[in-house]
């Protein structure tokens, strides 16, 4: 509940419990289209067996006893949780292309996301302190959905030592926006 007393403080400290919601894809898409938000689809290069295993892992994650989880906006969020499930199904065979440039610190990356909300930045600085000043790893930077999308699009997967690496993303498309009156 975003309106609960102390939500921002608890959020920045990683003390908020989130409840996983389940929607049919058409309902999800309609919601994003209503908000005029962009939806990028990445179809992953999975075998039918891997696709089924991922689907089953998602079903287990959505079971009533697993739906509520301690949300951490850096380490256990809507980007990191599915990434971890995909990597588990692929037995950690995803190989990410490491960026050539130096990576930002946690503080720099959080400031970029928090934008023009100085009170949010202040709260995060207060709650997380000097640990924010070390450079992130590329994997840690994937807490941001657009960084994860880029990482997936540049990654390869090699199923066995004697097989060729193939692109992790089979294809990508931006789903059309519909404007509502």
Show where each model-derived region lies:
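Soluble extramembrane regions of membrane proteins in the secretory/endomembrane system
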Residues: 1-179
């Amino acid at each position: 509940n975003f309106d609960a007393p102390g939500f921002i403080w608890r959020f920045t400290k990683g003390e908020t419990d989130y409840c996983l919601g389940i929607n049919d894809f058409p309902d999800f898409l309609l919601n994003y289209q209503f908000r005029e938000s962009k939806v990028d689809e990445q179809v992953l290069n999975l075998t039918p067996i891997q696709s089924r295993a991922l689907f089953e892992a998602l079903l287990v994650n959505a079971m009533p006893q697993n739906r509520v989880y301690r949300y951490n906006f850096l380490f256990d969020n809507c980007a990191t949780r599915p990434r971890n499930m995909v990597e588990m199904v692929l037995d950690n065979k995803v190989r990410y292309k490491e960026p050539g440039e130096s990576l930002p610190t946690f503080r720099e990356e959080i400031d970029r996301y928090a934008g023009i909300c100085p009170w949010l930045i202040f709260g995060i600085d207060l709650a997380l302190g000097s640990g924010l000043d070390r450079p992130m790893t590329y994997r840690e930077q994937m807490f941001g959905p657009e960084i994860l999308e880029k990482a997936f699009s540049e990654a390869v997967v090699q199923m066995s030592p004697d097989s060729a690496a193939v692109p992790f993303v089979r294809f990508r498309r931006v789903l059309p926006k519909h404007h509502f009156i």
